Amino acid sequence: MSTTAYPDTILIIDFGSQVTQLIARRVREANVYCEIVPFQSADEAFKRLQPKGVILSGSPHSTTDIGSPRAPQAIFDAGIPVLGICYGEQTMCAQLGGNVESGHDREFGRAFLDVQEDSPLFAGIWAKGTRHQVWMSHGDRVTSLPDGFTIIGTSPNAPYAVIADEKRKYYGVQFHPEVVHTPDGAKLLQNFVHRIVGVKPGWTMGAYREQAVEAIRKQVGSGKVICALSGGVDSSVAALLAHEAVGDQLTCILVDHGLMRKDEVQQVVEMFREHYNLPLILVDASDRFIGALEGESDPEKKRKTIGRLFIEVFEEEARKLGGADFLVQGTLYPDVIESVSFTGGPSVTIKSHHNVGGLPERMKMQLVEPLRELFKDEVRLLGKELGLPDSFIGRHPFPGPGLAIRCPGGVTREKLEILREADAIYLDEIRKAGLYDAIWQAFAVLLPVQDRGRDGGWPHLRIRLRLARGDFGGRHDGGFLPLRHEFPRQCGHPHHQRSPRHQPRCL
């Protein structure tokens, strides 16, 4: 829930779709502020936010079921534009007097939309009489329209694929414009918020920076502030915002648990101490962490051990400073959204960062969460606004438990060193191939498999690694980026391998 009032807001009502966050990201990309709220609290949110327009999301539910989710009637009484997506279209029709039935022919995946009429919703992208690819995912279908609606788009299995009441500015689409598989979907959503709702593109990270800094100053006053700096983008951007707001009232603590990427600790320390003059305490606790993980093979127990030790070390260092009144935390908007239950109602508490969970209560600190209204891509833009280098902002996501979670079995310094080096080699080759920025995430995993061989007469132990890569473009609704077959061989080229006298060979 936003703590700041934005005059031009779009309200997104979430009926439980897996891709609702993508709707919000597309609206934010159009430089318009929006909030996602679960349908259970939509009435309250509508009164509080007074949005200029509303988007109704998809849902796994069926409007034909008794007790299925509905949009607040106040939305349709307010005289503001409404866009229903998939289930959102269906519930809008059902609530306004139309009819929805369970379909015999379900429509999932790529489909083709035939544009029947020109509309402001299609301005600049689709014209009457043309056909375009969209992405469908529905079983139910609209079978009759409420008064005032007309059909402006059809598909072979959805005769009411796009409907409109142009007078009241109500629109419904049976497909999902928020996913990349609808190529013009983002532009369609832009048309809704800019042309139909009439909201101007005023949501920028420059404006957000000013508001966030002022909000931190107001919250903190003359209090003492600490921040757990992990070296990741989120905590770094949060720390810079806090430092801009309160200066030397802030002290950052970086706990080196020995599980970070190659040269990461040194890079973070140099950047924040030398470039930003940010008060930073570096704590080398690697022996403590690695010692506790040495005989542990269960990934969940590893994560909990790391979390527990982090709290212990951070708490010890914070007490050396004489305690603090506030703790800066890099909570993001998805953390807030994901803390809401769509079966039991909104959660009272917000999901804590895995590393600092429990610290505010134990040390009687108040949380400062300057990023809680932002998505990850917006945090990167804010980081750029704050002057963080592109090479830092664009780094791939890295898990809180670090390399320990990519090292099956017990953790040792030798295993970590092998994995750290292999990961660096892999990412170096990804960069050389010009693929780093196209891939959301790529990393090496040390497999618990070994064999022996000889290389030029030298006996060696061969350690097997898995090279993984995630979806491309940071889209999270995409797929895997195919690599050339010879790419893994390049990563294992002899010029990357240490002398067999000193290091095992990695395959």
Swiss-Prot record:
Its EC number is 6.3.5.2. Residues 9-202 form the Glutamine amidotransferase type-1 domain. It holds the Pfam family NAD_synthase. ATP binds at S230, G231, G232, V233, D234, S235, S236. GO terms for molecular function: ATP binding; GMP synthase activity. InterPro entries: Class_I_gatase-like (IPR029062), GATASE (IPR017926), GMP_synth_C (IPR001674), GMP_synth_GATase (IPR004739), GMP_synthase (IPR022955), GMPS_ATP_PPase_dom (IPR025777), NAD/GMP_synthase (IPR022310), Rossmann-like_a/b/a_fold (IPR014729). Keywords: ATP-binding, Glutamine amidotransferase, GMP biosynthesis, Ligase, Nucleotide-binding, Purine biosynthesis. It comes from the Bacteria. This is GMP synthase [glutamine-hydrolyzing]. Catalyzes the synthesis of GMP from XMP. SUPFAM superfamilies: Adenine nucleotide alpha hydrolases-like, Class I glutamine amidotransferase-like. HAMAP family: GMP_synthase (MF_00344). GO terms for cellular component: cytosol. Homodimer. The active site is at C86 (nucleophile), H176, E178. It catalyses: XMP + L-glutamine + ATP + H2O = GMP + L-glutamate + AMP + diphosphate + 2 H(+). Pathway: Purine metabolism; GMP biosynthesis; GMP from XMP (L-Gln route): step 1/1. Residues 203-395 form the GMPS ATP-PPase domain.
